[in-house]
Amino acid sequence: MAAKQIKFSDDARKRMARGVNVLADAVKVTLGPKGRNVVLEKSFGSPTVTKDGVSVAKEIELKDKFENMGAQMVKEVASKTSDVAGDGTTTATVLAQSIVTEGMKGVTAGMNPMDLKRGIDQAVDAAVKEIQSLSVPCTDAKAIAQVGTISANGDKRIGEIIADAMQKVGKEGVITVDEGRGFEDELEVVEGMQFDRGYLSPYFVTNQDTMMVELEDPYLLMVDKKISNIRELLPVLEAVAKSGKPLGIIAEDIEGEALATLVVNTMRGIVKAAATKAPGFGDRRKAMLQDIAILTGGTVISEEVGLTLEQANLDHLGSAKRVTMSKENTTIIDGAGVEADIEARVSQIRAQIEDTSSDYDREKLQERVAKLAGGVAVIRVGAATEFEMKEKKARVEDALHSTRAAVEEGVVPGGGTALVRILNKLVDLKGDNEDQTHGIAIALRAMEAPLRQIVTNAGQEASVIVNQVKAGEGNYGYNAQTGEYGDLFDMGVLDPAKVTRSALQSAGSVAGLMITTEAMIADDPDEKEAGGGAPDMGGMGGMGGMM
């Protein structure tokens, strides 16, 4: 086992604090509407320009192992806040730095670290309750657009597009962010259920101009197997042909004789049909076929439940108002499924979302919920260069997380004002002893830090503006974008309550751990350098002429 370096008490805490400060100083320049950019080197390709706090934090690794531990712990603050609320990473980092700096001073002055931590925890818990009582529900499109604008660093167009997308697909809908092809940002909304499988043969196409299959009021046959024998399909085809309606077939695959016969009958006009493959793979394919069946009021023909294709009749088929198929996608619009069955299916998938630990599975399950309950919106980000595209896409994703958080837990006055308002309400909070009360004071002082940093980044004098905001009441605060004071709700400077709450809780939690650290252990770098070196290359003489 390699030898270790061990640092104790003041020496350990000082090194850790240095790491905290290096990381926080790099991250906090991005805070607020006038935050600066940070340029990140990439081992391949061009550097990345970002104003996203968590992206900056993730890039930082320090040479000194003890300083690096401090930096990594603050990185955890940013990551945790990002995971919970999707934004607020820079605010959380600024709060953590302030609590750690002031807390370390208290410990150095001889205060009890555990009592300081208890005081900090007490202040954070009280502040969280105040945030909840201060928050206002965020339901109208205007407020949602304002939250999106703030999170996208003051880009109004992004805020409006997100509000528009949320209105169109609802709270359950999925909104994805893609890179666009032009200079303009665009919003594309897919109504109904769309999946990424197109028609199996171009001979099914009904609209030659758009090369699309369009089936009006069709029957839908869902089959959980490969169809290659036409005899299996004949009973259903004959029944559908008699009814005079079109038929859409969604199966694992259709090939050979079955596909050829289907194409010939369609071209002759005997039956109007089109076929596509079922979406997904393995168990996910079965689940998605079941989703489609419930949405359209049909039954999946599956031998697993003792139902063969020869036994299928019109009662087993689903139906929809319209089905369209392109070369890549199939869309089912206005399925004839029973509302109660669809809701039950959505609840079932939601329960699976709660249970799953895989981010990939969770994302796929959420997509299924959206396809059943809401819809899917795609925001295509436009920009002049690839640099700008990547930076803008990251901002749009941040803004999207923020607006979701705002709809979930409401909004509070933005620009660091909410924490200053709460600080005023908690001035009389006292601990069980003097050290705990000092811990409370540390947390309350830290609550000014985000506003101070926003003002500093905007090039103004922090103390003057903080005192002016403290003297005000309610939603009165400072708008760093315009340099004006006033009602922040009227100005559209809003923060999601969930983001402010998560930032404070994450910062308080990790900073409390740092203050109560008494020893740090790391690998000894000298030990590694001494052993494991490459052998002497003495036998390489005679190669001097290669210089």
Curated annotation (Swiss-Prot):
It is an enzyme of class 5 (isomerase). It is found in: Cytoplasm. It catalyses: ATP + H2O + a folded polypeptide = ADP + phosphate + an unfolded polypeptide. Its main location: cytoplasm. PROSITE patterns: CHAPERONINS_CPN60. ATP binds at residues 30-33, 51, 87-91, 415, 495. Keywords: ATP-binding, Chaperone, Cytoplasm, Isomerase, Nucleotide-binding. The keyword S-adenosyl-L-methionine does not apply. Residues 531-547 have a biased composition (Gly residues). Residues 525-547 are annotated as: Disordered. GO terms for biological process: protein refolding. Together with its co-chaperonin GroES, plays an essential role in assisting protein folding. The GroEL-GroES system forms a nano-cage that allows encapsulation of the non-native substrate proteins and provides a physical environment optimized to promote and accelerate protein folding. Belongs to the chaperonin (HSP60) family. Forms a cylinder of 14 subunits composed of two heptameric rings stacked back-to-back. Interacts with the co-chaperonin GroES. This is Chaperonin GroEL. The gene is groEL.
